[in-house]
Regions:
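C-terminal regulatory/oligomerization modules of transcriptional regulators
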Residues: 1-17, 128, 139-160
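Alpha-helical linker/hinge and terminal dimerization helices associated
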Residues: 29-40, 75, 115-137, 152-159
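N-terminal leader segment of winged-helix/HTH proteins
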Residues: 1-47, 94, 111
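N-terminal positioning helix adjacent to the helix-turn-helix/winged-helix DNA-binding module
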Residues: 21, 52-53, 114
Length: 160
């Protein structure tokens, strides 16, 4: 197995950056994603919600008052796809739209109280799993993990 082109200050390859170790990490990301998706799909009514809907609701939950273009950018989906998701969620009263106080052409998006409670219920097992893993790992590991994730996401944004 080859090493990726990273060396520590002394010039020798960093063992955790061997290609096989990086591939193992990638496989772990895939497995975690699959497990989280399964937990969510087991808890939702698939006639109403899909993973895209839950992700949309989560982003609005984290950013109350977010506007359409910001949500579209965060989800990295087309205008047409987001319109389809939002139309359904607004029609079923999961999302509340309010006219933006600074620009009447824009609408701020919020979750209803019922939707916030439902989302908390759906995500509770995942949040508990993540919290438990963070507690077992210690603060340095949590900071390192978050730094890795943020570096991956920043690189993706820079490549776009």
């Amino acid at each position: 197995m080859s090493d990726l082109n990273f060396n520590n200050p002394k010039g020798s390859p960093l063992l955790y950056l061997r290609e096989d170790k990086v591939k193992e990490s990638l496989n772990t990301f895939f497995n975690v994603s699959k497990n989280f998706e399964k937990i969510i799909t087991d808890k939702i009514n698939n006639d109403i919600f899909g993973i895209a809907d839950i992700r949309c609701l989560l982003i609005i939950n984290l950013n109350p008052g977010i506007i359409f273009n910001e949500l579209m950018e965060e989800l990295d989906i087309s205008k047409q796809s987001l319109n389809r998701v939002l139309k359904k969620l607004i029609h079923n009263n999961f999302i509340i739209q309010k006219i933006n106080s600074e620009d009447a052409r824009k609408k701020n998006l919020y979750l209803s109280n019922q939707t916030n409670k439902m989302l908390d219920n759906i995500l509770e097992p995942i949040l508990n799993d993540i919290s438990e893993a963070f507690q077992k790992s210690g603060s340095n590991s949590v900071q390192g993990f978050n730094q890795i994730i943020n570096n991956i996401l920043k690189r993706k944004k820079n490549d776009s």
